[in-house]
Regions:
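Extended hydrophobic
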Residues: 212, 263-279, 391-423
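Short, positively charged
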Residues: 65-75, 375-394
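Non-catalytic, conformational "gating/processing" segments within enzyme and secreted inhibitor domains
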Residues: 33-39, 83, 124-282, 289, ...
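N-terminal secretory signal peptides that target proteins for export/translocation
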Residues: 1-3
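Extracytoplasmic/secreted cell-surface and envelope-processing proteins
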Residues: 106-112, 285-288, 323-325, 378, ...
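A generic structural signal for residues located within well-ordered alpha-helices
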Residues: 91, 207-208, 398-399
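Detector for small/aliphatic-rich hydrophobic stretches
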Residues: 7-15, 19-176
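Catalytic and substrate-binding regions of extracellular carbohydrate-active enzymes
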Residues: 295
Length: 423
């Protein structure tokens, strides 16, 4: 009788499932652990067995920015549920899905490539290698990837080689149904999110055969920190209609955002490499309708048309949010269907196609804390398997539901995008 198996990936965590006998297939493979290791819960680090090759990289250009912006907008708006505080990391999810598509073929690959902005996987691998290296060159942002294979599994080396070459992934072999392995995975996640996400998975899964995990950790101080004199207590009017008095941080910023339906600002972090951006829909624009209207093109236009050196009187609440979600329904809305169907999914470049691997889980966890010192944010994905006259100061008081982002100021791409509906 065939046994149902699962692959898990991302922090985003993505879980692949499979109707499978022990793995085999074409191409060179990584060998199994011993029965003794499997029974004892030993985690073997196989990374040193795979030398990292220079597979090439490509700096972010107009094509990549358009693809990444489109993916970011779709991921956010399709995951948002009316009135619910939401926070996703397009960077974490894009990295995780780009990693897993290296194991896909046929229509499964076509759907993944289309959802990831239309770039073919070889091009995306090169873009992601350069982009992640670029983002993590400073001290503010850390990106980590890992592939965990079950001790009973022989994974194709071509897939693992790409994981190491393009994503600097660590490769582990362990009995994934063991509680000790779950503890090891959570320890890896906690370490690589600086403790902001202590766990990505709660229970051992006896059907799991592989987990691909991405972790992102961001921490930066404001370029101009707030002082105690900048703190004011104001009312925040939540989505539910309730009002709550909370601490607002008051400042004058110099980048004004406007798209006809919302106004906002950008506030730089120290060194100017990243910025916090917020958009407040006009009084007559419903937050749900505004989020539904977002697209990659609209996001790029908001930032490309930003009015610099235009004063903005900003009042922003301190806030903290934790978010956890399964993203399969969201990804289906984005056009990825076959990957989640045990009969249609084709992950034959990950394992033998006859093993019937499919994605069974996509777990995404995020965290953010914004205060007068700066911002801390983290994400984990597990996939199983202009010259102007002096204007009046523009007021932007975030005293009702608003959209916010942490933005890479070089590409204007959001690393995190969320909506705060309650305080």
């Amino acid at each position: 009788m065939k046994v149902k198996k699962m692959l898990a990936v991302f922090m985003s965590v993505l879980s692949l499932a499979a109707c499978t006998l022990p793995f085999s297939g074409c191409g060179k493979i990584i060998g199994n652990a011993s029965d003794k290791d499997a029974k004892s819960g030993v985690v073997r680090n196989l990374t040193e067995n795979i030398s990292k090759n220079d597979s090439g990289s490509k700096a972010a250009d107009k094509e990549f920015k358009a693809a990444a912006a489109s993916f970011s907008a779709d991921l956010f708006k399709y995951n948002y549920s009316n009135g619910k505080t939401t926070l996703v990391s397009p960077l974490s999810m894009l990295t995780a899905l780009a990693l897993v598509q290296n194991g896909a073929e046929g229509e499964t690959l076509v759907q993944l490539e289309r959802a990831l902005g239309g770039l073919d996987r070889d091009a995306l691998n090169k873009y992601m290698r350069a982009y992640c290296d670029f983002l993590s060159a400073g001290d503010e942002l850390k990106i980590a990837n890992s592939v965990w294979t079950d001790s009973s599994v022989e994974a194709k080396q071509a897939f693992l080689q790409k994981a190491v070459d393009s994503y600097s992934a660590q490769i582990f072999s362990a009995p994934l149904s063991s509680k000790k392995t779950v503890s090891s995975i959570n320890s890896w996640v906690k370490k690589n999110t600086d403790g902001m996400i202590p766990k990505i998975t709660e229970n051992a899964d006896r059907d799991a055969v592989m987990m691909l995990i991405n972790a992102v950790a961001f921490e930066a101080k404001w370029e101009t920190p707030y002082t105690n004199d900048d703190i004011e207590k104001l009312e925040f009017n939540s989505y539910s209609g309730k009002s709550k008095k909370t601490e607002f941080m008051c400042s004058t910023e110099s980048v004004y955002l406007s798209d006809g339906d919302a106004v906002g600002f950008m506030k730089p972090y120290k060194n100017g490499r990243f910025a916090f951006a917020a958009l407040l829909p006009d009084e007559d624009v419903n937050i749900d309708d505004y989020i539904a209207s977002l697209s990659g093109e609209k996001l790029m236009k908001i930032f490309s048309s930003a009015k610099k050196n235009e004063e903005v009187d900003v009042k922003m609440p301190k806030f903290k949010a934790e978010y956890s979600t399964q993203l399969i329904d969201t990804l289906k809305k984005m056009g990825i269907e076959d990957a989640f169907d045990r009969k249609s999914a084709d992950f034959s470049s990950l394992i033998d196609k006859n093993d019937g691997a499919y994605i069974g889980t996509v777990m995404h966890k995020t965290f953010i804390e914004v205060d007068q010192e700066g911002t801390r944010a983290a994400a984990a994905t597990l996939v199983g398997i202009s010259k102007m006259s002096m204007p009046a100061i523009n007021p932007v008081c975030l005293n009702r539901p608003f959209v916010y982002m942490i933005v890479d100021t070089e590409t204007n791409l959001p690393l995190f995008i969320g909506v705060q509906t309650e305080i």
